């Protein structure tokens, strides 16, 4: 298979610097890596943080962002096993880990101190060819719609793992804060498929319509409802059994600690820059509330999340645009105007 020397990609050279759509070199895979011809990539709010450089974790510069890449294996290093040319493969946030530390041995690879992160410490999927550690790359079934599956590789895996972390049972109420965004819209569908009743919180044009179209039961528009806590308590007859916080709002996180049910769990997923998690200690102790963080997912979570997708239980509400339009997508993200998930076609 002929592999070009150069390719189109979006790169920036300094934090919040110009996003340049230009010709860049095609990377060479290391001994343990795949070279993937990326066809489509989802665009995640984390990509915006990587560009802004506003998280406490240092970003590689210059950087090609992106960590929801779906494509075809076109090359591999000499030590790679279990893959062949032509396989469908996914590039995840966790590009690689050491597989030898205590975290990796327990299946918590995302907590590996040597983790390599796509679109953050490792050039990601906003280019036509990208590399990924063969152990962590996602196996995608042949014939899968690569545009549709791209958001599952981060957003889907992340919310699926978060729902597992909430320790819910069928029939329980789960509140999803940020329910109509890229992560939230998938969380609604995974929650429904897992047998939960879904309450969504979001605000803005078209968001309630999207929420209801994917099976959500109760929607609360924070731009219209002044008492979010009271509204959730009333709708769920005492509070949500679990909360999945995917919004990037510190106030939303604090509110979730007040509308979660006694003995319930609020799961933190979204990471607003510089935000703190504030919970009234008396309320937390007396109600026996758990507050936990959930950070992407491991290889088993990946396999399970992709299985839900393959069986038609979840579908990404996507809008496909050209990779060259990435700066415009970031602008929409900064203004909170994203409904569903944008996916970029690397050929445009």
Swiss-Prot record:
N-acetylserine sites (modified residues): 2
GO biological process: amino acid catabolic process to alcohol via Ehrlich pathway; glycolytic fermentation to ethanol
Induction: Expressed in the presence of glucose.
Subcellular location: Cytoplasm
TM segment ranges: none
Other comment: PubMed:320000 sequence has several conflicting residues and reports microheterogeneities at additional postitions. Analysis of the sequence suggests that the sequenced protein was a mixture of at least 3 of the different isoforms of alcohol dehydrogenases found in yeast.
Function: Preferentially fermentative isozyme that reduces acetaldehyde to ethanol during the fermentation of glucose. Major enzyme required for the conversion of acetaldehyde to ethanol. Plays a key role in the carbohydrate metabolism through the regeneration of NAD(+) from glycolytic NADH. In the reverse reaction, preferentially catalyzes the conversion of primary unbranched alcohols to their corresponding aldehydes. Also shows activity toward secondary alcohols. Most active with ethanol, and its activity decreases as the size of the alcohol is increased.
Top-level lineage group: Eukaryota
One GO term describing the cellular component: plasma membrane
Protein's name according to its UniProt entry: Alcohol dehydrogenase 1
Binding site for Zn(2+) 1: 44, 67-68, 154
Similarity comment: family membership: Belongs to the zinc-containing alcohol dehydrogenase family.
Documented effect of changing residue 46 to S: Has the same pattern of activity as the wild-type enzyme for linear primary alcohols
Subunit-level organization: Homotetramer.
A single MF term (Gene Ontology): zinc ion binding
Residues carrying Phosphothreonine: 223
Catalytic activity: a primary alcohol + NAD(+) = an aldehyde + NADH + H(+); a secondary alcohol + NAD(+) = a ketone + NADH + H(+); ethanol + NAD(+) = acetaldehyde + NADH + H(+); allyl alcohol + NADP(+) = acrolein + NADPH + H(+)
Keywords assigned: Acetylation, Cytoplasm, Isopeptide bond, Metal-binding, NAD, Oxidoreductase, Phosphoprotein, Ubl conjugation, Zinc
